[in-house]
């Protein structure tokens, strides 16, 4: 498979991490296996990346325990206290000047946004790149959920067609936060620009992985798959924010984006502020409904399988198999309706309320989401281009 040219070439490189990069020499900071010398010492990718970000952004951390260097810094505990981790980096003689004189990140590096995902999982699980949903299609949802919930849900009666079975099978229990992987809890969810940026990158990545995990989706023509994904990514992203409780307060988001009245014209700034408020409102409405994993999975299918694209020219974006797409959306709605009647029999209006919430997912423009969550890291590269390149990669 030929690699894309230009600024997208790095995207596939990040996805093709070779085990030969992992050495038997331990990381001087945490003791994990190093991937070579970084800033003068042998270090793992996690610690070298942490050191680079800390120095480049002039981070000042406070020790969580107040011991000023007494917190353990090893493979298991390295994420618990950033102050002690940075102190350990300096103690083992990581070179700050090497970071400052290093060539800065290029705005064309799409791979940085993808790397955020992998770095986050290395931080939690060592070198593992597994994340929720990677084993899909797995056991049917009704089998999994009966082992976790006190209610015995007869979901087998809902999944009466292959399409519905595929949709129901998507609703594997998912972590509360993108940082929480394979049962390993995130130590503290810190409302910091780094946390939000990495979470946004993971949401984008998992939207792609999720789409490729849907059997009915992958049977559509590739051109239809790409149109659907490019059209629905905004709604999938907002649903992910609601599902995983990512902070959307204006102070945090403006810090994430680096936007302010000094570097942006007033009219554009006012539009972004209005859309941040709209994002807060729609996320609040979804969280008030307290959706479970199955409902989120069905809603993702409903917003993805739109037979008429909501973005762009209909002439330029005509589907090759619009009837199949429409049928899949019908199946997703029927599945959600049947599930709600089974799971929430005392809430007869719940299905209608959830459907009425879906248009609100489009109250935030794709351009604002790109500007706030991604532009600082990937520059002017369109998200749709990133989505297309990543989706076509055989490594995902």
Swiss-Prot record:
Name used for this protein in its record:
Nuclear receptor subfamily 2 group E member 1
Q: What is the lineage of its organism?
A: Eukaryota, Metazoa, Chordata, Craniata, Vertebrata
Question: Which Gene Ontology BP annotations are present?
Answer: cell differentiation; negative regulation of transcription by RNA polymerase II
Known DNA-binding region: 24-101
**Subunit composition?**
Monomer.
Q: Write down the CDD domains for this protein, in alphabetical order.
A: NR_DBD_TLX, NR_LBD_Tlx_PNR_like
Q: Which residues form the NR LBD domain?
A: 153-394
Record keywords: DNA-binding included? yes
């Amino acid at each position: 498979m030929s690699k894309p040219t230009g600024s997208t070439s790095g995207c596939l490189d990040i996805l093709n991490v070779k085990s030969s990069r992992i050495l038997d020499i331990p990381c001087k900071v945490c003791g994990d296996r190093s991937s070579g010398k970084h800033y003068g010492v042998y270090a793992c990718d996690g610690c070298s990346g942490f050191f680079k970000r800390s120095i480049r952004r002039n981070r000042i951390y406070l020790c969580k325990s107040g011991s000023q260097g007494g917190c353990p810094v090893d493979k298991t505990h390295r994420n618990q206290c950033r102050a002690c981790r940075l102190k350990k980096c300096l103690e083992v003689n990581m070179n700050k000047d090497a970071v400052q004189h290093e060539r800065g990140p290029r705005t064309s590096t799409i791979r940085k946004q993808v790397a955020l995902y992998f770095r986050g999982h290395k931080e939690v699980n060592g070198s593992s790149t597994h994340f929720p949903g990677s084993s899909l299609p797995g056991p049917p949802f009704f089998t999994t959920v009966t082992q976790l919930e006190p209610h015995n849900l007869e979901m087998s009666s809902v999944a009466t067609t292959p399409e519905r079975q595929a949709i129901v099978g998507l609703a594997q229990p998912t972590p509360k936060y993108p940082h929480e992987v394979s049962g390993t809890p995130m130590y503290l969810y810190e409302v910091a620009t780094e946390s939000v940026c990495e979470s946004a990158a993971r949401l984008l990545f998992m939207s792609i992985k999720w789409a490729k995990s849907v059997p009915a989706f992958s049977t559509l023509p590739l051109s239809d798959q790409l149109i659907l994904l490019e059209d629905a990514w905004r709604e999938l992203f907002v649903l992910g924010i609601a599902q995983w409780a990512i902070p959307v307060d204006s102070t945090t988001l403006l810090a994430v984006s680096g936007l302010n009245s000094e570097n942006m014209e007033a009219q554009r700034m006012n539009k972004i502020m209005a859309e941040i408020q709209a994002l807060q409102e729609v996320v609040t409405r979804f969280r008030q409904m307290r959706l479970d994993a199955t409902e989120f999975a069905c809603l993702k299918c409903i917003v993805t399988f739109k037979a008429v694209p909501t973005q762009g020219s209909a002439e330029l974006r005509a589907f090759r198999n619009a009837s199949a797409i429409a049928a899949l959306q019908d199946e997703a709605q029927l599945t959600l309706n049947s599930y709600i009647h089974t799971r929430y029999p005392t809430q007869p209006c719940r299905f209608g309320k959830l459907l009425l919430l879906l248009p609100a997912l489009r109250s935030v423009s794709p351009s604002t989401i790109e500007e706030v969550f991604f532009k600082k890291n990937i520059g002017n590269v369109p998200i749709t281009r990133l989505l297309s390149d990543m989706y076509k990669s055989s490594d995902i």
